[in-house]
Amino acid sequence: MGVALMQPAILDLTEAERVRILAKTARFNPPPARLADGRRELIGLSRAELAAELAAIGEKPFRAKQVWHWMYHQGVTDFSVMSSIARPLQEKLAENFVIGRPEAAVVQTSTDETRKFLFRFRDGQEAETVYIPDRQEDRGAVCISSQVGCTLSCRFCHTGTQTLVRNLGAAEIVGQFMAARDSYGEWPSPRGETPRLLSTIVLMGMGEPLYNYENVAKAMIIVMDNEGIALSRRRITLSTSGVVPMMDRAGAELGVNLAVSLHAVRDDLRDELVPLNRKYPIAELIAACRRYPAASNARRITFEYVMLKGVNDTPADAHELVRLIAGIPAKVNLIPFNPWPGSVYETSSGPTIDRFANIVMDAGFSSPVRSPRGRDILAACGQLRTESQAKGSAS
């Protein structure tokens, strides 16, 4: 797909960079999925891994399908309620395995009904997840974190002030969505066109998903499995600040919707706002967007653009944005800056945002202005942060 369009020399360089990224990622691996008592966490295992774990205790392959159904379609956490499995096997499973969830250490609900979860994992580390309900329809998006902390240090983002602690494992990523569904009682998984209250996943929480690609991909493959949660890839959006070498792979292997945190149209400014730009500048990022295989008129790439007063909000910026994305099936989400303690930026004025949006729309691109949600509980875009710290950090 996208990779096949690249010249060999570029492909070799990109592949080498992918290897480097994955090797660096391994330094921040999540803790083992086996508990101190020897039991194995089943959430987060692929179908093949689940079958292998059951085979190791003497069970046949069809048992994996049964357990998968109970975990991901029915949403159970107790083997004793798996009515299609005989009691002796239920007890055997309970002796060897566990079906866990992250602990909801704190749950806050905004005046606009946005709900923020502070999830605590087995090693005590924490990440935040946000459910954003649609106020017109019975549906909503779950904003999921991929890392504890973040390594990117984007200047306008609260998460960027928190050092990267570690990656989240597939179980912890899937677990956020499952625990949110527990909170709203959305089990068993709706089928077909049946409306879903938690209808979409946006990988826009804490962390850079493409710096934890293996775990994110594994989690999303589980979520998309038709015999479990069965969420369509069209209902999943992966947001990246521009880890260019991993974008081709994500497009080829997952094919989910892509959102790009752009925020500036000149390299000198983006170098400051999104330091990752120094490694993968705007021209490389836009080229990767053009290669992204899911991009079509029906599945547009979303460019996220935070509106910062006097920084990136001029008509010249808007015209340059239009020039950059010309020919890409795209929409531009304009995000009024959401303040957080210690931030140095202000949001652009309403008229300034409207003027910017009109320039983009006049060029033929949808340019909605995102309505801030959950600001009063620091759950809006760019406001997520926990107190988790890397080992050795000051307390």
Predicted features along the sequence, with ranges:
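Auxiliary Fe-S-binding modules of radical SAM enzymes
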Residues: 1-127, 131-133, 188-189, 290-298, ...
